[in-house]
Each structure stands twice: as C-alpha cells, then as structure tokens.
Amino acid sequence: MGLEKSFILFSLLVLVLGWVQPSLGKESSAQKFNRQHMDTEGSSNSSPTYCNQMMTPRGMTKGSCKPVNTFVHETLADVQAICSQGQVTCKNGKSNCYKSSCALHITDCRLKGNSKYPNCDYKTSDYQKHIIIACEGNPSVPVHFDASE
C-alpha cells in the first residue's frame, strides 16, 4: 500500500512539474521590453560601435540579426510613466500605445546593408525624439516599442 501511495504521489509531482517548468524560464513581455530597449546606464554619444556592443549581449543576434532596434537612455520610471500619457493608435491598429509628452534620448540601431549573420554590423544613430510604446497590465507597463518621431 505504501509503495502504491508513493508511486501516485511521484506521478502527481511529475505531472505538476510538467505544467510548471515551461513557464519558469519564460520571459514576460515587460522583461523582454526592458532587455531589448532600456539602457539607463549608457549612451552611444561616445561610440559609433555602441549598437554592435549592445545587440549581441542583449540577445538580439541569436540565429539572425535583428534588423532594427531602439535603446532608450532614460530611467525605467520615466519610460513607465509614458503608459499614462497621450494614448495613440499602434502601428498594428491596437489602442494600447502611448506617446511620450517630451523628447527622450534614444539610440537607433540599424543593420548595415552588407551585414550578414553571424557577423551582425549595426549603424548607430543618436536622437532626441518622442517615443511610442505599447503598455499592458495593471499597473500598466511597457511591453513593446512601436515607434519614435
């Protein structure tokens, strides 16, 4: 009887771990936004190789070169505050995008035309622009970088 009970408990444990385990290492949309777009510490002003230095460690050159990416050089709190600013329509037609009320320091990274994986080579461009981000959740947090203007 004890062996049967142990087998049943073990089977239940395996079943539960099968459900839970896939979600343990999964990155949330907010975490992905932070990884791909936030650089509160840095600025590309001093380095034309900024994008090349940032894209690989941030996981945007795994399997292919991400063609375009924007880094925001502001505090996370300032970027999160955009989620309560001017609501605009996203490029995909959804209504969960918000435009910053002031221009922010950003760096655009664009894949150079002759660049091919695995040697991803990016052009670095600094700007002061308004950004448009998609926000979700309660509290509302950034989950997608939609545009800059």
UniProtKB/Swiss-Prot annotation:
GO terms for molecular function: lyase activity; nucleic acid binding; ribonuclease A activity. It holds the Pfam family RnaseA. It is found in: Secreted. Its EC number is 4.6.1.18. Keywords: Disulfide bond, Endonuclease, Hydrolase, Lyase, Nuclease, Secreted, Signal. Substrate binds at K32, R35, K66, P67, V68, N69, T70, K91, R110. Pancreas. Residues 1-25 form the signal peptide. It is an enzyme of class 4 (lyase). It catalyses: an [RNA] containing cytidine + H2O = an [RNA]-3'-cytidine-3'-phosphate + a 5'-hydroxy-ribonucleotide-3'-[RNA]; an [RNA] containing uridine + H2O = an [RNA]-3'-uridine-3'-phosphate + a 5'-hydroxy-ribonucleotide-3'-[RNA]. The active site is at H37 (proton acceptor), H144 (proton donor). It comes from the Eukaryota. The keyword Manganese does not apply. One of its GO terms (cellular component) is extracellular region. GO terms for biological process: defense response to Gram-positive bacterium. Transmembrane segments: none annotated. Disulfide bonds join C51-C109, C65-C120, C83-C135, C90-C97. Endonuclease that catalyzes the cleavage of RNA on the 3' side of pyrimidine nucleotides. Acts on single-stranded and double-stranded RNA. Belongs to the pancreatic ribonuclease family. Monomer. Interacts with and forms tight 1:1 complexes with RNH1. Dimerization of two such complexes may occur. Interaction with RNH1 inhibits this protein. This is Ribonuclease pancreatic. The lineage of its organism: Eukaryota, Metazoa, Chordata, Craniata, Vertebrata. The gene is RNASE1.
